[in-house]
Regions:
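Hydrophobic alpha-helical connector segments
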Residues: 74-103, 155-159, 203, 220
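Short hydrophobic/aromatic patch on the recognition helix
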Residues: 40-51
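Amphipathic C-terminal alpha-helical segment
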Residues: 96-100, 136, 140, 159-178, ...
Length: 220
């Protein structure tokens, strides 16, 4: 790679990182040419030498953030037993990522993407991000007969909608319960869906203990 290409990639990286930092800390409303340029350490005119507009940058951030989420899930589940246990752990790790970075959640699920040139690609990445980070375990569960192939898409859809709904209420502070209760409810709804749709009740020989001020049960 020539020196000019190396410099170009480095400067692009500065602008991309500046945009990601703004999105994580302050949300999409803070993202404008001047803010990005100031944080990157360049003039705003320089940005247009490397990107067509802010939408180009934001789309790259969506793609990068999805990669970060996928890596987070992988790192936090690699020691879990394959199958339902790792599937549950993957869903929790996905939730934990967005609890840690609510600005990314807002970008993914609350902002209007109508002005995105690559709206279709961005929407696909975002909408099915939970399915994708769990894809290996869904396939494993089907291959081992833990889940029926005919039911998997329905289960995915139900878990996706329930998980995102719970996250939206929590991150937007529409509910007053603490993080521990969020995880309790996540496990309850995930197990309820798996048990109602799978031949073995989504059982893998283990269980999840769930406790709060109102309930104390063991979901198997």
């Amino acid at each position: 790679m020539k020196n000019k290409e190396i410099q170009e990639q480095r400067i692009k990286g500065y602008f991309l990182q500046a945009t990601k930092d703004l999105l994580k800390s302050e949300g999409l409303q803070s993202v404008n040419v001047r803010n990005i340029a100031d944080r990157a350490g360049y003039s705003y005119a320089t940005l247009y030498n490397y990107f067509k507009d802010i939408n180009d940058l934001v789309f790259l951030c969506v793609y990068d953030f999805y990669g970060e989420c996928e890596q987070h899930v992988r790192e936090h589940t690699k020691r879990q037993e394959r199958g339902i246990k790792r599937l549950r752990a993957s869903i929790r790790a996905y939730v934990d990522f967005f609890v840690q970075y609510p600005g990314i959640f807002s970008l993914f699920f609350m902002e209007n993407l109508g002005s995105f040139k690559d709206k279709g690609r961005a929407t696909e990445i975002i909408s099915f991000s939970l399915d994708k980070v769990c894809e290996e375990e869904w396939n494993y569960c089907v291959s081992k007969g833990i889940l029926q192939v005919e039911q998997v898409e329905l289960i995915k859809s139900q878990i996706r909608h329930a998980t995102l709904g719970l996250l939206m209420l929590y991150i937007n502070q529409r509910v007053s319960f603490p993080y521990t209760e969020l995880i309790n409810r996540l496990y309850l709804q995930t197990n309820a869906i798996l048990e109602s749709c799978s031949p073995g009740g989504g059982r893998d020989g283990g269980g999840v203990s769930v406790h709060n001020s109102l309930i104390s049960i063991k979901v198997k």
